[in-house]
A protein has these predicted regions:
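DNA major-groove recognition helix of helix-turn-helix/homeodomain DNA-binding modules
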Residues: 1-14, 254-255
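Structural motif corresponding to the intra-repeat A-B loop/turn of tetratricopeptide repeats
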Residues: 8, 39, 78-79, 129, ...
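Short C-terminal boundary/hinge segments that cap the last helix of small helical domains
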Residues: 8-26
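Structural signature of alpha-solenoid helical repeat junctions
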Residues: 25, 63, 107-117, 152-159, ...
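"A position-specific structural signal for the A-helix of alpha-solenoid helical repeats
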Residues: 31-32, 63-71, 114-121, 159, ...
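Amphipathic alpha-helical segments of tetratricopeptide repeats
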Residues: 49-57, 90-102, 140-151, 185-196, ...
Length: 255
């Protein structure tokens, strides 16, 4: 039922009312595992994978999809093994999308949030392996899907800005700075409307970088200064300093 609601583009708020204690324990463990993966805490990911594995011994299907995804992220982050990570991600996505080849979008399919998360990770792996156009193709699919099919909700608020952030980065790598600016600008507007503070400063930064690459240094300086101010307000002084150093080194913009 939960996945049906997701494919219809909404969140299932009835889920907690109709599950057993064991199902709720597994659901909570999987949600915690997803949070650990998002935070990139390798030790917590290892511990939570072990916990979920014990809870899924006699269960087949969708729960193993998330487990394979988490193992793929662990291999990518801890072991830096991109090939093994891709193998695990493809095993995960093939549980529900057996026809997906890892490159070509399946635009007629409805997607769950887990599938969006896995496809995004596959795109990131393509980019890390130098296949930036493959990454852009997949991420544009997810962008369009989230805009057209998914109504407002917590998962959209969390995931959609990061998809735009990735696209902004990858368009920049390919020298498509107008497109990089457009993706970052769209992400900033979304963050302001829906309150995603975590993604906001990095998207503002990408706006500034894209403008600098286009030679619009005064406008670039404005957005990069905003980025530094927000990072400092969030007490992320290391991130603020990284922006300051980057601006000085690459664009001779001093703060």
């Amino acid at each position: 039922m939960e996945k049906l609601f997701e494919r219809l583009g909404t969140e299932n708020n009835l889920f907690n009312s109709f599950v057993s204690r064991e199902e709720m324990e597994l659901y909570s463990a999987i949600q915690e595992l997803i949070r650990d993966v998002t935070d990139g805490d390798i030790k917590k990911i290892e511990i939570q994978i072990s916990k979920v594995e014990k809870l899924t011994v006699n269960i087949s299907g969708l729960e193993h999809q998330c487990l394979l995804f988490a193992k793929g992220e662990l291999v990518k982050q801890r072991d830096k093994d991109q090939n093994k990570a891709m193998e695990l991600m493809m095993k995960a996505i093939h549980i529900t999308l057996p026809d997906f080849d890892g490159i070509n979008p399946l635009r007629s399919n409805l997607l769950t949030f887990d599938e969006i998360m896995i496809i995004n990770s596959i795109a990131v792996l393509h980019a890390k392996n130098g296949k930036v156009m493959d990454a852009i193709q997949l991420e544009m699919w997810l962008k369009d899907y989230m805009e057209d099919k998914i109504v407002d909700g917590k998962m959209k608020t969390a995931k959609y800005p990061m998809i735009l952030y990735n696209l902004s980065n990858w368009f920049g790598i390919k020298g498509c700075h107008h497109e990089a600016f457009q993706m970052a600008d769209l992400g900033v507007d979304f963050c302001v409307s829906y309150g995603n503070l975590a993604a906001f400063p990095i998207l503002v930064s990408n706006k500034g970088v894209a403008l600098a690459e286009l030679g619009e240094f005064e406008e670039a300086r404005k957005y990069l200064h905003q980025t530094i101010t927000v990072f400092e307000a969030m007490k992320k002084t290391d991130r603020a300093q990284a922006v300051i150093d980057w601006c000085s080194m690459h664009y001779n913009i001093k703060f």
